[in-house]
Amino acid sequence: IQPFAMLDMQLYSGKRLDSMKSCELIALPQQMDIKQMAYASVIAEVTEALTEAHEPQEDIYELLVGAVQILSRNNPRLVALSAICKLLVLTGFAPVYDACVNCTEAVEGDAFFSVVQGGLICEACHGGEELPFSSGAQKLLQELIALDFNDPQPFTVRGGDLMQLEQILYRFIVYQIDKPLKSLSFLAQLGL
């Protein structure tokens, strides 16, 4: 079975392993290069970590289909990060990014992010161990959550904001699932 293909499968639950009764190909993904495949793997691993097996979740399925379809036409790094942001929202793990998680005051401008508390920390509540969370990275998070995979509109991304948001989200996810993401090691090996 080709990775990231859309399939219609009939599975039967076994004691230790499921068995496949039938499998029909619905669609193959666009041809992917190694970079696109690596980012698709990150999306798949995060999805597996944040969702329950054997629980149908149509909204997550549609998100994954949309992400795979645009990976080859758009910046795969941004597509993957957008898909992860959307997954966090759909699975109830979305970080708080509009108000301080300590004092609940609205935050405008640069702030910090607490991986442990799962959200924004204002300057007054900053304890020293939080990650920097610039206003640009906050805005990028909002844009990635709102990105329409069916009709992606162009927007400008500063490299520093992208790297900061990636660091925040990947650390947050690793903290939530309590294990490293192997696909991130693969990205690092590729120099991505």
Language model regions located:
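Non-catalytic alpha-helical scaffolds and adjoining flexible linkers that form interface surfaces
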Residues: 1-192
